[in-house]
Amino acid sequence: MKFYSSPLLSIGLTAAAVLLSHRAVSAEPGITYQPAPSFSYAATGDPTNSSWQQWQQEYGPTHERRVQWWRQARFGMFIHWGVYSVPAGVWNGTNVTRSGAEWIMNRGRISVADYQKLPARFNPVKFDATQWVDIAKNAGMKYIVITAKHHDGFAMFHSQASGFNIYDATPFKRDPLKELAEACAKADIKLGFYYSQAQDWNHPGGAASGGHWDQAQDGDMDKFIDDVDIPQIKELFSNYGKVAVVWWDTPVGMTADRVAKLLPLLKLQPDIISNNRLDAKKATGDYATPEQKIPTNSLAADWETCMTMNGTWGYRASDQKWKPAETLVHNLVDIASKGGNFLLNVGPTSEGLIPEPSVERLKEVGAWMKVNGESIYGTTQSPLAAQPAWGRVTQKGDTLYLHVFDWPADGKLVVPGLEMEKQKAVFLADPQTEVPSAGVSYSSVNLSRSVTTLQLPAKPLDPIDTVIIIKGYKSL
């Protein structure tokens, strides 16, 4: 299996969530029994935290309504695009490889004055919003989240709050977010904005990881929030139609008082969902955000893994270490089997193009999703007590989807925790072909746990992931 996983994460969940921690029980080789958690939005945050209190009072009651579409979507595109695509990871002839290419100003300790020269070289004339949306839609993605402003402080939209934006500071003289919003609306793709509310290395008073390195960055953070954050967020929430998601990041210095200034702005978009990175305590938000990792087990809250296709978020010309499409599909399935969403990143070039290796892989993922999307959209975590060694399991109502990554050499697919009676197993890609059961046995460790064995043909229908449907599943 080619998917990325990690030990159980402690990732600072939303105020409404706790990370389930439990010990797996050893069983037969290749089978690990784990208690299946239940999902809820029960308040488990610190009741003395004022940000948590404000969130619960103002947005907690509407959480279930607001996240319904997101739970159905399961798969989205993250876009890290900004003026950092001009140096593309290189500054004064040196590859700045620490962190993603979007961090070049910080990691290269580039002065504000020097960085402000980059927009003059940023003219992404090949940008085509419709093409980008088509790439996402054809890959099976249901929503897009794009960097409206990253930590460098450069706004990728026409902002009246700061001239350091793509419309006023570049020869491009267009608002790509406006064009993207229109293209998304036409294609029925939901659009969200990433906004760096704390770190801002260009505007005085903005925070910086590791501290300021240029006197031009010094200033009052509260004034920065008043003069830059609030007006820009108002612009994003007022001028671009329906905004589905706001994706905050790195809440350095985001005290309860500062959070209290920004939370009311969400009311400009009553249906918007917010991640858990607005405040330093991660006490607010609708969902948790493991980054570049997939939790070993399901979480007790809504969650979304964001991940790159190579080693960087923003475009770095030298980074050609691309994950294969097989890995991307397996990651998507692994995440869905644990009740999460997958936000997969692309880093467009300074010309406005999504790199071809990303496009190629998304086409491959899309081909798989065209046949098997039913096993991802609107599914919930696996109900089985074991993560099978051969793949993953998703569920929708009384239907199970067995995702077979590793085809058994002997043709016998062992499904722990499943007892088939009158249920019929068929291939999702070929519903007319029944998959016969070779019988039901019981675990040698726990006799109450049934193990069904399915007899598979010699070769998989899809070498990446062959999906088998079992309808009429009832929890034992």
State the predicted function of each range.
Residues 15-16, 64:
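Helix-centric, low-specificity signal for extended rod-like, repetitive segments
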Residues 27-476:
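Mature catalytic domains of secreted/periplasmic carbohydrate-active enzymes
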Residues 1-12:
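Bacterial N-terminal signal peptides that target proteins for export
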Residues 17-24:
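C-terminal segment of classical bacterial N-terminal signal peptides
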Residues 1-3, 25, 453:
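Generic N-terminal simple sequence motifs
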